[in-house]
Amino acid sequence: VILHIQDWQKLLADARVRLFAGENAFAELRAFLPANTGCPWPKISVTVDQSIWPAGMTIDVLNQESMAIANQHLAQVQSELRMFASTFTPQSIAEQYSSGKPLNVLGITSRYTTFLKHSMRDWLSAFARLGHRTEIFIEPADHELSNNLVMAEACARFKPDLIVMIDHFRAEMPGLPQGIPMAMWAQDYMPKIYSPDGGAAQGPRDYVLGFAYEKMRLVHEFGYPSDRYLITTIGMDPERFAPRPADDPQLAKYVCDVSFVTHASLSAEQIVKEQMGRNDADAKRLLGSIFEQLRAVYDAGKTIVAPPGIRRMIEQGFIDTRTQPTPELVQQLMHLFYMRVNNALFRHQALHWLIDLGIDLRLYGRGWENHPAFKRFARGVADHEGELSLIYQASRINLHISPLGSLHQRVMEGLASGGFFLLRRSDGDIIGRHYARLWGFCQRLGITSDEQLKACTDPQVQEMLGQAVDIHQCDPFAEKYTFMQLLQTMHDCNYLCSAGCVWGNDYDETSFGSKAELEKKIAYFLGNPLERQRLTQSMLRPVLERFTYEKTTTRLLEMIAADQARVAMQSKIDADTVPLAA
């Protein structure tokens, strides 16, 4: 009757609606739930005809029954996966990974992310271009969820030789089998990763990819295995970012003097004001004390990029406001002031230098239209899929401004698109040069420990140590790892995290550290298109040689093969060793 009164065609056609009708309606619902655990189960039922439901049956009882059936099925699937994983041995893994034969690579991600699902897509595309079979595990629709059973079923069906995830490790996903090699790309700060539990959860076939400094923290502070950590940066896909013909009509819309792409449009003052609005009077005083210290640095025309400098301001804020610190509060304040407030101050300071230059400046990203000083330059959000490449190529100068450094995916994608960049100089970009010089001296002088390094009286060594202290904003010998371990790690990865080392003289030509330097370089490069083209091509070469998803993927597979070969060899040695008689 109600369907004659109400037009529910659109409602009933929605993918979120499951319609069970007729005399077998309940039986069909009962069978559907445990067989479709990715679909959220109903929590509320409205009964019109009680005869449809068996006596004593409610939606809660039905869900409990369905959960029991699903758990039984999960146990069965996990048993099958254990049988499959038992066929993997160190020797077989090493041989398979080094043979060049196609692997089955399962990538796990979520549609409820922004950047990460695109990064996983590009990573799997690199595996495919290298000849491997790939499958992505992702929620099939916006209303569906992943869980242990759905994940285990995907593994049982695809039978992966390698599982890859971003920002999650195996132990977080109980549906994943042990024994099959798994790689986590740690791209963001995640509390579960940065914890002793995260390190302790790493099994003998768990591998990590991540940044160089993060390796030092994860290995020496949280217990991650050093020999199963691959230092890299977030990759780029040259297949998705490539220059178009110069006469492509789509470029015309984006031609400008200078462009900058970022969603970091909120001013530092707005960020702090929003935080104050969520807290009591005592917290407001603490936030205000820290912010005034940080803002004074930028008001003086300076910058701060090293976390210890921010930490000291937070510690001073505790003293000034007589606030009792806790580790959790310190961590929250570090995230707020280092990752957000300082980021805004660093970026917006440089943008203010451009306002009066009379150039065609365009800002792409969310919220710029609301910024009182910059709203006239706002051009809306750029689509990552196609528009970004057009912006990079059409802009005479692209800017990259970040206190975290210039070896960023956006810069690499922009270079691959044919875009020229000016980079705001950061200490993190050039410290690799100091490390390289210092490592060279240590090698020549036979220095192998922190004690020897501190005791060295060579004036050049002392000068370089002083430079390291200035950049680190702290005692480099007071970390949870030794300074020599840091120097060794940076040397072993060929200073992959240092833009000054990767791009060499090109970095010096394209970086700026002051308003006067930025104005001078903008004027010069706007008038020299051939120089822009030369530097773009020169800076792209090391990107293609070292930072594409394919290069990183190849290095990962080589690391896994070598690691498992070592394990196999050690097992053979142990088996062949005859214990001495007592």
Which residue stretches match the model-derived regions?
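N-terminal donor/sugar-recognition subdomains of glycan-related enzymes
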Residues: 2-104, 134
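Short, charged, surface-exposed secondary-structure boundary motifs
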Residues: 3-12, 28-33, 191-199, 217-221, ...
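Extended catalytic core of nucleotide-activated donor transferases of GT-like folds
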Residues: 6, 92-96, 106-222, 240-243, ...
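A short, glycine/small-residue-rich beta-strand->loop->alpha-helix junction that serves as a flexible
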Residues: 84, 111-118, 337-343
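Catalytic binding pocket for nucleotide-activated donors in carbohydrate/polymer assembly enzymes
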Residues: 100-101, 106-109, 121, 125-130, ...
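Short, solvent-exposed loop/turn segments at secondary-structure junctions
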Residues: 111-114, 141-142, 168-171, 188-192, ...
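Catalytic core of nucleotide-activated saccharide and alditol-phosphate transferases
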Residues: 180-319, 551, 567, 575-578
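Conserved catalytic-core segment of nucleotide-activated headgroup transferases in glycan assembly
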Residues: 245-389, 393, 447, 452-453, ...
